[in-house]
Amino acid sequence: MKIKGKIRGLVLTTLKEYIIAKKGKEGVKKVEKKIKEINHSFSFEGISSVRWYPANIIHLVMLLVLEVFGWSEEKNFEIGYEVPINSIIAKLMLRAFVSLPVAFKTTPRFWRNYTDLGEMNWVKTDIQKREAVLRLTDYPKVHLAIYEYFRGYLKKIMETMIKSKNLRVEITKSIYKGDEFTEFTFAW
């Protein structure tokens, strides 16, 4: 399926860093070799974190990484969770979120800084009850592993905001499973 849209190269640069940390530079070469086997000319070399890249290439690379190393969909959760730790852009974003209400208000704008696909908005934010629901609409139906990446990324960002490791994030609705949209439910 061809996905129309763009995503910042940050996803690829942090994925490359993750592969190097877990599998060394040889791991990156294995992924690039697999990509060439399917007749694609992608290379991690020269990828810029701030440039826009076709979303279908980024999704393809993320899925091929799982295949090359025999990793499960849940591994993408771990990758997404570790990305904000290594990303200067994510660290700057976290500094801009001075409180949960500000984070809730500015999430849609930050989503736009990363991709032109879909819309991300909070549909429930109850700080007293310690729960929130984030909805992703108009995002293409892609492999569940991509949503696991989002879940990991969102968990790490939210943990940093609430300064708690007791946070749970679940995908409670998923376009991948036939729902109209994807929702991430947070409880802490």
Regions from the PLM with identified roles:
Residues 167-188:
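Beta-rich nucleic-acid/ligand-interaction surfaces
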